[in-house]
Amino acid sequence: MRDNFIKNCYKKILAADSVYDIAIVSPTQFAPKLSSKIGNHLFIKREDLQPVFSFKLRGAYNKISKLKNIKHIVAASAGNHAQGVAMTCQKLRLQSSIVMPLTTPTIKVNAVKKLGSKVILSGDTYDEAYNFAIKYAKEKNYNFVHPYDDLEVIAGQGTIAIELINQLEEHPDYVFIPVGGGGLLAGMTVYLKTINPKIKVIAVEAEDSACFNLAYKNGKPTSLKHVGIFADGVAVKKIGSKTFKLTKNIVDSSITVTTDEICSAIKELYDETRVIAEPAGALSLAGARKYILSNKIKNKNIATILCGANMNFDRLRHVSERADIGESSEIILGVTIDELSLIHI
């Protein structure tokens, strides 16, 4: 049954070319400085170059463009899915309401408003905003679009993997994928593992919102008791049921990173590309650096996903201060890391 579920998802990914009505084919950029530093060939998939500065546009458009007889779209989001839904609805001339946590960065709230969507701020976390949005959509009889646990959304995100394979001369040895609710992980992993099972897929999570790790330990999606909000784009309490079903047996490994390690990766991305990634956007690189160092990987093709660049400017001082700590911890990490920090799947 699970194999059929994966096959169905793969077919949906291949049929998701409508995303290019609104999204770009983002470039995959070789990173010479980082490659030299880590002793591998490192590539960065630049999803920060999408019109809403995040990959989330793909899944939102793929889902909404297939809906029929729509009255009004409702979504819950910490920011990037919200912008994807808002831009999609603007293009398709649909009305939309977006429920966002009170902690959402102002840059994301304002971007959604500028795209013409109604913004409702509710709750301190994504999950609280989600619960309100579900209730609101039901009361109004509006269509709710899930940010990650929907096959059409997952398929839209999976188009990133198609581009990645087409853009590289050789298949990557490792692909590091950031995880919040698991939509990006599911879409990319299904495609990558279908075309080449030898590609190693590593899930990367912020250590204070590691819902995929918890689900794997328990064998099913399980709610975290606490969710950190520094990496707001992946601050999800519970992995999606569909995303976990698609990924639990085909993702090769999982790793978590600290806030300091994320800040260090933001700095490294700036030094390499002159782009300021949001915390979730730097998650993939942070995980790649930590995993490569701890496993002594050399001379491999490494693919990372810069999945978003929507961060308030006033957070930069905090990021700068923590980045130096993150770099220092990597030196210690090379000596002290043990297998307990990884879940091998």
For every predicted segment, state its role:
Residues 345:
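Short alpha-helical "recognition helix" segments of helix-turn-helix
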Residues 1-342:
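PLP-dependent amino-acid enzyme catalytic core
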